[in-house]
């Protein structure tokens, strides 16, 4: 995201709460493991990107209350499938062929989709032997959930333009000034609604 200090330069901004997105995955994991020890490997986004910083922060804040959950390795996968796969391969090799890993948390779905491939190639079952949690809600993550290979994703709404255009139309119509900041909803999706969400994405042109 772009940080503009002079707020007079824009009418409104529509954005997601990236810290909350990370927190929702952390909260889900706490419930999922129910007090059992869980070693997490983290696939970070692009180094220095505010989205990556915030998603890391939110997850870390959530699991701070759960001493049974530890991040044992964390490295940038640069928000790509290929890099996510490559880094996950190194995590698996470093952690007893993945046997020491309970969950992979990725700052976006693409990296976790790459990680899923690495997990399978190591002879493990993604979604079972190694849990997955990620952010964005892209169609392929719902496909992975349907296949039993992914566990949780927080949707980054694809409709950010909607509220922005609504604000612009109101301003043009009667001069109504919108709020400076509109935060879109962050929703955690699990396999039980994956088919439904995938159909919605198809209808939106994904």
Q: Which residues does each predicted region cover?
A:
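Structural recognition of the beta-strand scaffold that forms the well-ordered cores
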Residues: 1, 13-15, 39-44, 72-74, ...
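Flexible loop/hinge segments that line or gate small-molecule binding clefts
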Residues: 1-20, 31, 39, 138-146, ...
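Solvent-exposed loop/turn segments at secondary-structure junctions
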Residues: 3-6, 20, 35, 46-50, ...
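Short, solvent-exposed amphipathic alpha-helices that sit
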Residues: 21-25, 50-69, 83-88, 114-118
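Structured segments of extracytoplasmic/periplasmic soluble domains
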Residues: 28-36, 62-66, 87-95, 118-122, ...
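Short beta-strand elements in bilobed, periplasmic/extracellular small-molecule ligand-binding domains
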Residues: 39-42, 63-81
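Hinge/cleft segment of the Venus flytrap/periplasmic-binding protein
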Residues: 43-51, 62-63, 156, 160-206
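Hydrophobic alpha-helical
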Residues: 59, 73, 77-143
């Amino acid at each position: 995201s772009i940080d503009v200090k002079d707020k007079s330069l824009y009418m409104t901004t529509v954005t997601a709460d990236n810290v909350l997105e990370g927190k929702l995955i952390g909260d889900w994991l706490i419930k999922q493991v129910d007090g059992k020890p869980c070693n997490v490997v983290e696939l970070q986004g692009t180094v220095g990107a505010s989205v990556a910083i915030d998603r890391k922060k939110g997850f870390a804040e959530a699991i701070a209350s759960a001493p049974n959950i530890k991040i044992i390795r964390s490295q940038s996968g640069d928000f790509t499938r290929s890099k996510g796969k490559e880094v996950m391969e190194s995590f698996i090799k470093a952690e007893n062929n993945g046997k020491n890993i309970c969950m992979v948390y990725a700052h976006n779905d693409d990296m976790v989709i790459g990680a899923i491939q690495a997990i399978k190639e190591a002879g493990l079952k993604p979604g079972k032997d190694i849990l997955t949690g990620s952010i964005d809600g892209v169609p392929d993550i719902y496909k992975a959930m349907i296949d039993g290979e992914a566990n949780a994703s927080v949707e980054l709404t694809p409709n950010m333009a909607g509220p922005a255009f609504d604000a612009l139309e109101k301003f043009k119509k009667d001069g109504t000034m919108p709020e400076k900041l509109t935060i879109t909803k962050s929703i955690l999706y699990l396999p039980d609604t994956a088919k439904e969400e995938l159909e919605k994405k198809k209808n939106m042109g994904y």
